[in-house]
Amino acid sequence: MLAVERQLQTKVSYQFIPLVNMKTIQHTLDLYHLSRCHLKQRQCVSCMLYQVALDIKAASFQGGQHGRQYLVNVQKIMSDRTVEYTDEIVKRIAQLANLDWATFTEDRHSQMVRKSLRKDQTIADDLGVIDTPTAIVLDTCDPDYSLLIHDFTYQKLIDCARHGQLHINQDHRLVHK
């Protein structure tokens, strides 16, 4: 994100929302070459993705940077498709993200984290996000305006600003044109 801020010469605020829906579940089943028709496998994948999302949210309760670090480490470690998302792996990822283990353990099972994740999922659903990676750029000056960027990359955000879909005002904030 720092590269985007440098390129656009503006401050960009962002929040990562882990998305758990039928499409992400099916994508994971396909990625691991699991049957879409095998109910038990589908349920296991669904539970695992939900727990990963809860853990990312719990990590973010210790600060946004910790949440992002947890997300990045989950992606790195789980890219090895032979690794299972076990308590041992969770502890390793939490250590890499410099989380307070006792707080994280308590938060990842808390009702507050569940409610916060549910709220994030509702926001994503309300804004039409069904696939990852997707970004929603919100104009802080005009809350009715947002730009949905499918197959999000930082370069696409920069391109949107350069091609007139976004404008940087005198306060160095992204706004719609």
Language-model segment annotations:
Residues M1-Q9, Y85-K177:
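C-terminal cap of thioredoxin/glutaredoxin-like
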Residues L2-T82:
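Structural alpha/beta surface segment adjacent to cysteine/selenocysteine redox centers
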